[in-house]
């Protein structure tokens, strides 16, 4: 049984659409690569929280980015749920048997990498120790309190070098880690959808630096983005 505070997440996952979550839809014939991530809610020492990872700083793309545990599906993964749990175990040492899956969000598309991502929502019913297991992919493992994500002064709007704007969060004890991109978008828009978001100042901007996006790549190697999904509606705080 999940705690009462998590019921809006469970119910929201059933009702939310891809158009509520993302501005891009995969074009016909894109043949995207399949991947899955785990959005795992638990109850930590500071109250309800989310399990997140900080990507290794030497990675070729998005080094140091805060993200859900997860990755590309393997041929042995029977379902996206199985893939998300496997990846979380490989990255953090999480015991999948302690996770109750309470929802699966609509599949979303990442145009630059042509990944179709399934977000699996879990309740950490029986907690297990977590740590960095794969140092090639993960720099640190974080438990970020939900209250920290809801605090308006922890919210900023990122500015991509190409001009795109996106929701983001300042996390960590010193608020020195930037949670942005796909993971921040899913969290922000799901929280918007279920009514958890508190009014925040969207005019507080954080300009993304090239190294945060490209790693060892150069800006010229980043693919051009397609036209956005016109059905996606920007709302307050997005």
Task: Please give the residue ranges for each predicted region.
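N-terminal leader/linker segments that precede catalytic domains of diphosphate-processing enzymes
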Residues: 1-67, 72-90, 94-104, 108-121, ...
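NUDIX/MutT-family hydrolases
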Residues: 133-168, 173
């Amino acid at each position: 049984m999940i705690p009462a505070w998590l019921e809006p997440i469970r119910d929201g996952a059933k009702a939310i659409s891809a158009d509520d979550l993302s501005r891009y839809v995969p074009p016909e014939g894109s043949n995207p690569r399949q991947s899955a991530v785990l959005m795992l809610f638990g109850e930590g020492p500071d109250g309800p929280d989310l399990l997140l990872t900080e990507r290794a700083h030497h990675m070729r793309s998005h080094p140091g980015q805060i993200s859900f545990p997860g990755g590309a599906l393997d041929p042995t993964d029977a379902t996206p749920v199985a893939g998300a749990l496997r990846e979380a175990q490989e990255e953090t040492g999480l015991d999948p048997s302690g996770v109750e899956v309470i929802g699966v969000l609509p599949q979303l598309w990442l145009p630059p990498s042509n990944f179709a991502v399934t977000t699996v929502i879990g309740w950490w019913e029986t907690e297990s120790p977590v740590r960095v297991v794969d140092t090639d992919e993960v720099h640190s493992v974080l438990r970020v309190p939900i209250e920290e994500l809801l605090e308006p002064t922890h919210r900023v709007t990122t500015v991509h070098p190409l001009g795109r704007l996106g929701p983001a969060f300042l996390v960590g004890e010193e608020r020195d880690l930037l949670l942005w991109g796909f993971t921040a978008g899913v969290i922000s828009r799901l929280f918007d959808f279920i009514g958890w978001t508190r009014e925040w100042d969207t005019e507080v901007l954080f300009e993304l630096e090239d190294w945060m996006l490209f790693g060892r790549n150069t800006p010229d190697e980043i693919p051009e983005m397609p036209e956005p999904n016109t059905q996606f509606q920007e709302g307050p705080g997005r």
